[in-house]
């Protein structure tokens, strides 16, 4: 576009933008382009973000990491990363979305065209998440439907899928004492591996499609589609239920868990501090990666959700509250998990360490085994899998919403028209469903593990976080971004946030990133099955496909821009002049200012000429 400056009679210059040839759009097309929309109120934004960041990892990952890494001592490195990385980067992404009113790709493109690959990388990660995360919902639906029986099907060894090595819970202790068989299995394990997954011997043998899981996956996608098909108008209403219902289930399970025999021993096992574990660098790496996982950082979701805020929304206060809510939920979930694991260990007469699990092993093996030992086991099974379903559901459809938002902001003239959004969501759902069918084959679990271990791994998130804080702190300028934030919320955030962007966060991300690489251990399914070399190659391809976006788009944008290298670099680190500048009111808030002392031209020139840290 060309900039056109006119001067009013009062002497105030006004900037307008004239489309260049090829950018003209007839009036009919203009009228058809719909507005992005905004949240109806703050609560819709808060619940949507809470639904995205508070998910399955809070229940099945954090408690296990806490017990594994020194109990209460784990909170020391956890809160160091919480204040130096979690809150600063979380706030950065939300504020960026609110400031630019754009999805992940176009927001970074406007802030710094040279580093727009950050946004593209987040879209790649979102795409992977949309393919594999919803598989967990299909499993949860399968277990939920299986819970509506007189006897839970994973209680006994008399089912058609059980083998001669199956030993039910009543005979478990005596079998252990007699060493009846070194290869004995439990009915809950056989239900999981033989009835639900039908798992094969390895990734080389995918087997046939598990049609029941395929139907559950289809149902999950249908639910997700109708949760977001009308944009923030529908998403904002759905999260009132999906984001709050898991808390009701969590409270019910907490009350039930702490009243079980053996619960106290389980909670002590969860929280008893072992300060000597802090000497192990692995503890610190686990704390850092857990922060990035649980806060949904570098996935583009926070930027997209923040983009639907009003310009003067206090996103700083919201971000801090949401971060504390997320960590508090993880902490409380630990009481639920370990009170029930303590009960299960006491009932079986084994140490708690033998029943402690993380990930799918906790959700689909340990907990189903625990509920069979309770009175009214069908009720507790239904409640638990309903909680899992809703914990994962809002994370899934909000992630899909953010992917759609990024796409529509990249191509507004084509996609932001009547009926186009619904078709885009339908197309994304169909493509992701068809690709997801590969993960509900008999060998699909091996592929799921590759996605989970590599596609959205801590290495990818740490790498992108490093470039995010470098972009805002050093290229765009931390002081300049603080000016933008002050213009939005009316005051400047705590100085520690800026210090974190400039020094603490990049330092910790870089150190943790290289340590993660040095301590890399190849994926093993159940710590037994070793993938073939081509399987690991696929995993690393998934990881590098997102990280490679940053250097790749740096090279592409430099090659496409004309001029000397210095001029190209200067142009590519210059923010888009259409971004709001301090003193210029946002049109979406219904106010405008024509003040000569802070004219748009003057503000724009200040923004363009202000030196960056680079």
Swiss-Prot record:
List where Polar residues composition bias occurs.
Answer: 588-600
For the region Disordered, what residue ranges are annotated? 574-600
**The keyword Lipid biosynthesis is annotated on this UniProt entry:** no
Q: Which residues lie on this side of the membrane: Extracellular?
A: 138-210
Q: Membrane-spanning residues where?
A: 45-65, 73-92, 117-137, 211-229, 238-255, 291-308, 320-341, 374-393, 423-441, 458-478, 499-518, 538-556
Compartments where located: Basolateral cell membrane; Cell membrane
A GO biological-process term: neurotransmitter transport
Give the Cytoplasmic membrane side ranges. Answer: 1-44, 557-614
Which PROSITE patterns does this one have?
NA_NEUROTRAN_SYMP_1, NA_NEUROTRAN_SYMP_2, NA_NEUROTRAN_SYMP_3
The reaction(s) catalysed by this protein are:
4-aminobutanoate(out) + chloride(out) + 3 Na(+)(out) = 4-aminobutanoate(in) + chloride(in) + 3 Na(+)(in); glycine betaine(out) + 2 chloride(out) + 3 Na(+)(out) = glycine betaine(in) + 2 chloride(in) + 3 Na(+)(in)
Query: SUPFAM superfamilies per the record?
Result: SNF-like
Q: Which Pfam families match?
A: SNF
According to Swiss-Prot or TrEMBL, what is its membrane topology? Multi-pass membrane protein
Molecular-function annotations in GO: gamma-aminobutyric acid:sodium:chloride symporter activity; monocarboxylic acid transmembrane transporter activity
Q: Name one GO cellular component term.
A: cell projection
Carbohydrate attachment sites?
A: 171, 183
Q: What does this protein do?
A: Transporter that mediates cellular uptake of betaine and GABA in a sodium- and chloride-dependent process. May have a role in regulation of GABAergic transmission in the brain through the reuptake of GABA into presynaptic terminals, as well as in osmotic regulation. Probably also involved in renal and hepatic osmotic regulation.
What family is reported?
Answer: Belongs to the sodium:neurotransmitter symporter (SNF) (TC 2.A.22) family. SLC6A12 subfamily.
- Could you tell me what this protein is called? Sodium- and chloride-dependent betaine transporter
Question: Which organism is this entry from?
Answer: Rattus norvegicus
